[in-house]
């Protein structure tokens, strides 16, 4: 699986939701994306659906941390990454954060057959 990046502006925050493998060129593209964004917005990076992060991805996360980002990590892998890299975690997604493909309002996506 490749990297999927979704952004949403909500309540004075830019939420950047990552899904898949946060590696190489995809990670560098996220670095470019966040540096072009309005720095008046709080930056929140949701790592919950990230399955793998390579050294470049870790470097980008540390860069984003230096910009003042906070991180959402709801899985054991994403929590481990936040702990290991000492990324400030805010716990769960904001309740009114839109989750594309959401069918039940609780972040559960319909199964694909």
What residue spans do the PLM features occupy?
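STAS-like cytosolic regulatory interaction modules
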Residues: 1-113
């Amino acid at each position: 699986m490749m990297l999927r990046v979704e952004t949403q502006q909500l309540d004075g925050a830019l939420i950047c939701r990552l899904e898949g493998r946060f590696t190489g060129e995809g990670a560098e593209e996220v670095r470019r994306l966040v540096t072009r964004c309005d720095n008046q917005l709080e930056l929140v990076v949701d790592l919950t659906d990230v399955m793998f992060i390579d050294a470049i991805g870790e470097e980008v996360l540390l860069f984003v941390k230096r910009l003042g980002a906070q991180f959402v990590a709801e899985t054991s892998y994403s929590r481990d990454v936040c702990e290991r890299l000492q990324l400030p975690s805010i716990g769960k997604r904001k309740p009114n954060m839109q989750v594309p493909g959401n069918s039940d309002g609780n972040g559960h996506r319909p199964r694909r057959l």
